[in-house]
Amino acid sequence: MNVPLRLNLLLILFSLSFSAYTIYDGSKLIPISYAPNEDYDATEIVSTSAISQEMLSYYSWFASYGYCEDVDIPLFCCKDFINFFTEKWTIIIESSTTEFFDFNFVLWRSDEYKKYIFAFPGTRHDIIELLNEAVNIKLVNYNDEDNGIKVVNYFYKVTKEIRDLLFTSEVLKDFDEHPGYQFVFTGHSLGASVAADILYDAINRNIISPSEHNPALITFGMPRTGNEEWVVDFNTKVKNVLRVVRDGDIVASLPYSLINNPYTHLGGLILVNKELTSMYYCPKDIGEDYPDKVCVRTKSLDIKYHSYYFNPDTKFSSRCY
């Protein structure tokens, strides 16, 4: 077995033995009611001051929409998705392939809700291909600048491929014609990291001007995406980060932070319990080294904890419900 891969697997097993789930006094309990998320009032500004299960469930639909383009998924699995989106949202741009990766993305606009939503699904590769890619993961300089800001090469490679496909002159013109709209970026798994990278890149290229409530990032099962310097700089530009993780989701613990590759998580953790009955907002700006009585996630090799969020509303693995 490849040595880096063996080390990664040993680290997974080690963490499974020593992890525990507790909550700390600063966390905020958010009950899960399973109210139909199509009834959610999407005019609400996405922010960390107004977190609800209905809001997160609503945006999880967008994060999983891209899976509908998988040729192996029967059409009926996506019928409700399609009906849900076309009634309220206009597709501005949609892409299903890149040179490097079998990856798609969608940009919507709603004039009723005054929002743009950028959505990125996870990988459609099988687990063996993912493990092969994981062996070669490392941190690289963002934008080839030697300023200490580093991002994971695997996610950044996808980002660089799709950013010019996404931010076309027609799309930028559409932005200019709809001032004051909130930009919401969302994604699941790999797509969560790409959503963060694309958002960060758009700000640095002056495509989006950050403000108190704009833009916002909502992710589901997001892996670690950059180093601490990247996270700190990200936080100065994006004030509303909602990083949703289901307890037991092993992907949210990857890549493992090693001495020569100090991967760091964004803050804004919203920890959903394994039973999908409640969740806690853990207000911290960076990483997962909480003080006493911390929000600590358990880890499991059961992929369902990564594939299923807000069941029955969204099933990222089967995409049917």
Predicted regions mapped to residue ranges:
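N-terminal module-boundary/linker segments of secreted carbohydrate-active enzymes
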Residues: 24-47
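N-terminal signal peptide
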Residues: 13-28
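Classical eukaryotic N-terminal signal peptides for Sec-dependent ER targeting/secretion
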Residues: 1-11
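Beta-sandwich/jellyroll recognition modules and their flexible linkers
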Residues: 54, 63, 67, 72, ...
